[in-house]
């Protein structure tokens, strides 16, 4: 499942852009900045959730999709660690999901913000793991399903 930041032409939901008096049209639906990079491009079977706020849960149908699919655990990656990743992880925990944030698959504009966000998430909300731990987890799921 993927999320992407998409803004509407008529409304600027990004309060930071408003505060900084920035034009936020780079995140319109058809702009390159709102697209998922080719190397990680979703397949036809993948769900893509468009969001306008930091949390992937706020104002989106994400919770409905997860419940319908019987999901109990979320593995969160992406950016920014102190913004979208943190907001999504915290919201997922408040909805009773098990959550892991993948340390080496998340990023932030400033390394200090990245480290502080991961520390805060680990101390209060969820597991912070490395990508090799996630690979081992998926391998164990495959083995147990055979």
Describe the residue ranges of each PLM region.
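Active-site-adjacent betaalpha module
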Residues: 7-8, 17-146
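Von Willebrand factor
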Residues: 1-10
